[in-house]
Amino acid sequence: MRAPRPAVFLDRDDTLCRNDDLPPDAFPGKHGDLFLPGWVELLPGVADACRSLKAAGYALVIVTSQAGVARGACTIRDVEATHDALRALLPADPDHPGGPSLIDAAYSSIQHPTESVRGHLAIDHPWRKPLPGMLLAAARELNLDLSRSWLVGDKERDVGAGIAAGLDPARCLRVGPPRPGARPADEPDLAAAAVRIVRDTGGGEQTEVTIVRPASTASLTARLGRPLADPHTRRTVEAAARAIAERTGVALLSLELDERSVRAVLANPKPMAAWGV
């Protein structure tokens, strides 16, 4: 089995792409809930920063809060489409746009405990920052070494998620302008953070860019009742899911079932849309 590799976990909005200073037209819902692909614009220096981190041997994993889904402003399909637009702006080979991206995977927390209009998303989910769920899932699914990993984000809750996941606090960097009540940023932007990461650690163990297919998580939760309460039913659903994955060529990394929900991790760029979540 391949040895675990280090990662740089990246917040999305105002770390990789513009958000806070976008015009009102960019946000049909709440300001900050970016789910229109046409408004995705990289911040200065981001492409070169991602390329240098990738060349140094780091997996690049987006961990982002997208509660617009819970608030009813958009769907997981919209979030995935926005991620696709971001991936397209970060090609592994600039001479061949449309090919593999520098981004290995994108994880999104779509729940909100108090603002959700969708009952099944009105929870304080372990993927919500500053909880570490997204990072821990990525480490498990992508075979990542958290002890050698970094996190870069623009908010304290980003940093908190990294620390809660067990990352060295010195490797959890806040970037961006000063924020009221927050400590000073560690670096002005991702470009500066990337220079620091490569300088301080000498990068990972790889010397070439490694491209993997993004892993995504699809969750289906019953609104009423416990349709999977019967163990036989759960076994039948699990067998059917694995058979469908095998027939369609989708790599099913893991499958978890309980009495009300199914959670599948797929090595597929856009599984959420395929599952109709």
Label the model's feature ranges.
Residues 60, 169-172, 252:
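Hydrophobic beta-strand scaffold residues
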Residues 68-73, 159, 265:
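Short, solvent-exposed loop/turn segments at secondary-structure junctions
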Residues 206-277:
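Short catalytic/metal-binding and nucleic-acid-binding patches
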Residues 43-57, 85-95, 245-246:
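A short, N-terminal amphipathic alpha-helix
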Residues 59-65, 104-109, 255, 264:
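Short beta-strand segments at enzyme active-site cores
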Residues 1-61:
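Active-site neighborhood of HAD-like aspartate-dependent phosphohydrolases
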Residues 20-30, 61, 107-120, 214-223:
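Short, basic/glycine-rich phosphate-binding loops at helix/coil junctions
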Residues 2-4, 8, 77-80, 84-104, ...:
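Asp-based, Mg2+/Mn2+-dependent phosphohydrolase catalytic module
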